[in-house]
Amino acid sequence: MTAQNLYNKDFYGWIYHNIELIRLGQWEAIDKTLLIEELESMAKRDKHELISHLIILIAYLLKWQFQLKQLSQTWIEFEGKSWKRSIDEQRKQIQRQLNMSPSLKSYLLQAVAESYEDAVALASKEIQLSITLFPPHCPYAIEQLFDEDFYPTPDDK
């Protein structure tokens, strides 16, 4: 079976076939083109995962800042505990990902900028506030995003 056929019919087998070729030093037999494509795809997946976690984290921080006070006044028992758990979980997931792939840290500022528009859209939809009420750029510093004690001061909006 050719490398292309193995790739199309048994991806897992193709991976281990190429791993074995690398171990044996059979560099000419390695399916370089598809291997490069897969490695690039893995890098993109890691960036996409980071952005996904940032979207949720920033959206919940925005919800906390822009609606916690209003909901707490409407429902006396509302303390935002589920929001806090979501914020904590996203921080943990992002930290885990950065620990596993430290080179992603160099992409963090760009990832926050790329995530912000989607985070605003998510927060806006969930708490039914106009997108125009949110800041045009992420109002949180990188340090604040990962500070386990940071929860933005609720606005009066």
Question: What name fits each language-model region?
Answer:
Residues 1-157:
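Surface/interface-facing alpha-helical segments and adjacent flexible terminal/loop regions used
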